[in-house]
Amino acid sequence: MSQHETPLYTGLKKHASRQPVQFHIPGHKKGAGMDPEFRQFIGENALSIDLINIEPLDDLHAPKGIIKQAQDLAAEAFGADHTFFSVQGTSGAIMTMVMAVCGPGDKIIIPRNVHKSIMTAIVFSGAVPIFIHPEIDNELGISHGITLESAKRALTEHPDAKGLLVINPTYFGVAADLKSIVELAHSFDVPVLVDEAHGVHIHFHDELPLSAMQAGADIAATSVHKLGGSLTQSSILNMREGLVSKDRVQSILSMLTTTSTSYLLLASLDVARKRLATEGRQLAEETLKLANQTRDRLNQIEGIYCVGSEILGSKAAYSYDPTKLIISVKSLGLTGHDVEKWLRESFNIEVELSDLYNILCIFTPGDSQNDADRLVEALTEIAQQMSEQDVTHQQTEVLLPEIPLLAMTPRDAFYANTEVIPLKEASGRIIAEFVMVYPPGIPIFIPGEIITEENISYIFKNLDAGLPVQGPEDSTLHMIRVIKEQKAIQ
């Protein structure tokens, strides 16, 4: 088949055009049985293909027809041996690849700045995480990837590891030397798993970091919806045969996937793949041009710093994605969250994320020159407002806490006997739940780590700044769940 074809999307439209009488779910029956206002808003075309896995439309859990054809075309487009569609988001795809290689007690080497879905998979599987400290950018206050040297030390100390997981690229667009890391891991017969949630587009332009499949990785969870043009919650899992079992991946993915798979999501993956495969390079070229022009303009604004190629050069920053605009605002004396709120309220602009020091803006083929102009105008205005204030402000100091020590496996901690105590009194105790700022969803604490005063202070610093700290059962974070201490019987 040609990359210009869309077997799944075309098959759905053909089926809908026959207007069959539906005595099956979904109960809205092409919109006829739902609220009229919502039906009008969504549109009849979309509702006509909101279908289920009846025989003519194939089954994601055992694809043999139009879904298999669409997945095969995706594998060809991404240079994979096999591609699996996911309607459980990239989180579902990530959990699948971890659980496909790890069982209870198995070691997996991972950077500590992983997404919560990876740690969730480790809890589910019972795997033992071997953490690599990611390289820290103390100027920006963000984590990069892992270095070749740290990966080599981890593999040398733990040659029995069942997998090495790499983030490529990071949320902020920075990539390590993935090809060399893959070659190193393969010399130990260890498969490389890649969290490629923020890199679906990098496969299609040579000025972007190498994709997981280009670097020779064994399996990669790739988020098409984030930057590739499909609908939210749709993703793919690319893999190469050899160190990872295709049948095992299919089995685990099926276990984690709803039986009511959304054909709207699946169709959007099919058409997004077609556009990436046939127009991806040109689309990336135009996006890179707009992003780079915007970066140059932002760097003319006093107090604003938009990161460019100067971020490269460290061992963990081998290449980067210029379509991610990391905008440091600490010289304004404001937090990233302050600026995010101001952009929303004053210019109706929404950013991808903010932290204590930065905002992150993502450019895709969906952005226009007018959008870029508005961002530049807005940041020019807030910088001018800050410079005109009579009060002197100090540049925000970047503070990043040490990574906590892991005292027990995340699974053991998650299922242990626990109690709830005030967070302010929890220093020295072993935490039994996740604490993270979302986005990006990178844990401050994971179950099994020892709570420190430094990390408690960091949590309150994020809360005081208005950032979304999530994870604990107590959403106010006044209380935290910890492992119950076993006291001797008197």
Swiss-Prot record:
Annotated signal peptide: none
Pfam families from the UniProt entry: OKR_DC_1, OKR_DC_1_C
Cofactor(s) named in the record: pyridoxal 5'-phosphate
Predominant cellular place of this UniProt entry's protein: cytoplasm
Molecular-function GO terms, alphabetical: arginine decarboxylase activity
EC top class named in words: lyase
Location of the protein in the cell: Cytoplasm
Gene3D superfamilies xrefs: Aspartate Aminotransferase, domain 1, Molybdopterin biosynthesis moea protein, domain 2, Type I PLP-dependent aspartate aminotransferase-like (Major domain)
GO cellular component: cytoplasm
Family: Belongs to the Orn/Lys/Arg decarboxylase class-I family.
Protein name: Arginine decarboxylase
